[in-house]
């Protein structure tokens, strides 16, 4: 298993689950590049909370849908951290739009997130190839439990983009295996309800469909990330952390999505 201490990691999308991931990796002694798109204050606060416990940490602004921005981000992270072993990409919007209101702009917005996942994996993997050892790096995408065969309503472009991320996980894993780089995905189910998107009633309905009837915690996701990064023979996997909701299926009739 890999020793994480002293290795460099990019973590993109550092609010909610991403914040927990940054804090968990900091406890392992991982040097961190905290990447944000527009929430500078939140990124700075997160940086301040971890910088004293690790050797190196930095905050970098980037638009992941821009190839130029992503290349600049990876180059800067590698310089600031000394080397780059890990990339954890949680950057994604969660736009809820009823089918009747969908437009081309909704599709473009969702596909921009998938493009960002592709670009960041591409550039970070090229940096990882400069590392020594049989395991040179590890990329972790974040998907969605429902982006396989069980979609829920009102999130069509978002779930389509996440399905692309799931396929990218396997494709990148195959391409990068000869270079000693592992690629996996984590797909959360109901985790830390956002009241602006999901009502209490909808949340209860979502949990009722999960066999365990429990929501996952941000800390549980972060623990899984830390564990995955230590492993050296797991690649191409999509791990669903959803209390078994994918077994229960999607919501039908007049029920509303809650994840």
Language model features with spans:
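Catalytic loop of short-chain dehydrogenase/reductase
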Residues: 93-94, 133-164, 169-178, 190
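C-terminal substrate-recognition "lid" of short-chain dehydrogenase/reductases
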Residues: 217-241, 246
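Substrate-binding pocket helix/loop in short-chain dehydrogenase/reductase
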Residues: 98-99, 105-110, 206
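Conserved Rossmann-fold SDR core element
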Residues: 25, 166, 173-191, 234-241
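Canonical Rossmann dinucleotide-binding motif of NAD(H)/NADP(H)-dependent dehydrogenases/reductases
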Residues: 2-33
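Conserved NAD(P)H cofactor-binding loop of Rossmann-fold oxidoreductase domains
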Residues: 90-96, 244
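A glycine/serine/threonine-rich, flexible loop-to-helix segment
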Residues: 174, 178, 185-210, 215, ...
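Amphipathic alpha-helical dimer-interface segment in Rossmann-like NAD(P)H-dependent oxidoreductases
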Residues: 112-133, 173-174, 226, 230
């Amino acid at each position: 298993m890999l020793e994480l201490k002293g290795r460099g990691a990019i973590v993109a999308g550092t609010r909610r689950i991403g914040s927990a991931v940054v804090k968990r990796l900091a406890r392992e002694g991982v040097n961190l590049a905290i990447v944000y798109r527009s929430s500078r204050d939140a990124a700075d606060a997160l940086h301040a909370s971890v910088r004293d416990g690790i050797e190196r940490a930095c905050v970098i602004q980037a638009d992941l849908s821009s190839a130029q921005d992503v290349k600049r981000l990876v180059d800067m992270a590698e310089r600031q951290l000394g080397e780059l072993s890990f990339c954890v990409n949680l950057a994604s919007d969660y736009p809820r739009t009823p089918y009747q209101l969908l437009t081309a702009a909704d599709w473009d917005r969702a596909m921009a997130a998938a493009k960002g996942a592709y670009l960041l994996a591409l550039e970070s993997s090229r940096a990882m190839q400069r590392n020594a050892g049989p395991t040179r790096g590890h990329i972790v995408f974040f998907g969605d439990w429902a982006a396989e065969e069980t979609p829920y309503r009102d999130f069509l472009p978002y779930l389509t983009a996440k399905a692309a991320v799931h396929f990218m996980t396997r494709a990148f894993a195959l391409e990068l295996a000869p270079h000693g780089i592992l690629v996996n995905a984590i797909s959360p189910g109901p985790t830390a309800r956002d009241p602006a998107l999901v009502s209490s009633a909808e949340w209860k309905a979502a949990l009722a469909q999960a066999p365990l009837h429990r929501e996952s915690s941000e800390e549980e996701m972060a623990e899984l990330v830390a564990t995955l990064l230590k492993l050296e023979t797991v690649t191409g996997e999509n791990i669903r952390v959803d209390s078994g909701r994918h077994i229960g299926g999607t919501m039908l009739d007049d029920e509303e999505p809650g994840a």
